[in-house]
Amino acid sequence: MITAYIDFKSLDCFLAISPILELADDCETPVSWKPYRSTKRALPTQVANESITQTHHRVRAESERRLQQHYARLRGLDIDPSRGQIDTSAALGWLANLEGDSSSFVSRLFTAHWIEH
């Protein structure tokens, strides 16, 4: 069994769904989807006298955002990064209470949140 901890508002999690499902299919094993509440850090802005730590956080956040957009484009997805700020707690609660194979629920909800909004 593959155990995957996910948060519907996480773009990284959304981009990982297809590979996880493909791996599970290739290995003929089920996926146990576990809700996980992540916190989205705001994209830091450059300030006049920023410290080395502030510079590091800003550059890293910008790099993460560009990398996510790159992988989304490779998969032909048009992603609005602001969707990561929307609260998905209710959906995580539903997931926690589902029994059996919840892969279709997870896949549909991620698509609805990130693509069809």
Indicate where each model-derived feature is located.
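Local sequence-structure signature of Cys/Sec-based thiol-disulfide redox active-site neighborhoods
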Residues: M1-I20
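Structural alpha/beta surface segment adjacent to cysteine/selenocysteine redox centers
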Residues: I17-H113
